[in-house]
């Protein structure tokens, strides 16, 4: 991204468990309005890296910065505008979309005891609907719908909406299209593109390479805890990406 300051930046980040080096000297930058995909084989370090990016796990060494300020915890990262959606989504299925969106705020501030008690239902629905409209998410038309009645794709979108209710700098997604059918995958990818178009920085982990190539601006390939390639997604194929992931043709992969 030309002449832009990064929204989220990692500087020489390492993570070590005893003698095992999960991450080694990772440097990356994410910019407003772009979609970055972290790709790598199982055990490459993707989940560890994303947990460090969202503040859920401290690095052994190195810095994690949001708009130039170092973060030191999950709560601090959230306050700085970093939203995270894990693969299991962690939605309360007996609650509505709106209640889940506000529950995310309350669990971060007052804990379960204060959850949802500070706002009446009508106001909650109104504000949740306004946020959905602002984000341009057309697939969640009724925020009063219980999560248990949503499709798999709609649940993923509801989790994204919850993360973005209070975090507006960057969104991190762990396997957002896992176990979804083609129609639901399309719904989620369109939501991701809509969010990025509004200026959000988005980073995702995915094994679904065709979906990644359909939505990502940049690819970062991890191997054994190191980013070995950073390159535009445009022009890449499933075959070329897999070759980079396993280490074939390293001399030409980044050309």
What residue ranges belong to the model's regions?
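Glycine-rich phosphate-binding loops of nucleotide-dependent enzymes
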Residues: 2-255
């Amino acid at each position: 991204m030309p002449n832009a300051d990064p929204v989220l930046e990692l500087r020489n980040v390492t993570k070590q468990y005893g003698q095992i080096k999960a991450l080694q000297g990772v440097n990356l930058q994410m910019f407003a309005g772009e979609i970055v995909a972290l790709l790598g084989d199982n055990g490459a370090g993707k989940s560890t890296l994303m947990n460090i990016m969202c503040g859920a796990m401290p690095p052994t060494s190195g810095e994690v910065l949001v708009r130039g300020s170092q973060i030191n915890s999950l709560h601090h990262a959230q306050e700085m505008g970093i939203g995270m959606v894990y693969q299991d989504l962690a939605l309360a299925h007996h609650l509505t979309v709106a209640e889940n969106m506000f529950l995310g705020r309350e669990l971060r501030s007052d804990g379960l005891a204060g959850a949802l008690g500070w706002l009446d239902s009508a106001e909650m629905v109104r504000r949740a609907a306004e946020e959905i409209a602002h984000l341009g998410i057309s697939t969640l038309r009724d925020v009063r719908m219980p999560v248990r009645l949503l499709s798999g794709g709609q649940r993923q979108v509801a989790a994204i909406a919850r993360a973005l209710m209070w975090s507006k700098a960057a969104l991190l997604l762990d396997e957002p299209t896992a176990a979804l059918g083609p129609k639901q995958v399309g719904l989620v990818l369109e939501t991701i593109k809509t969010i990025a178009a509004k200026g959000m920085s988005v980073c995702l982990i995915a094994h679904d390479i065709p979906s990644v190539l359909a939505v990502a601006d940049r690819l970062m390939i991890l191997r054994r805890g190191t980013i070995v390639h950073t390159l535009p997604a445009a022009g890449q194929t499933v075959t070329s990406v897999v070759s980079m992931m396993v280490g074939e043709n390293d001399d030409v992969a980044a050309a």
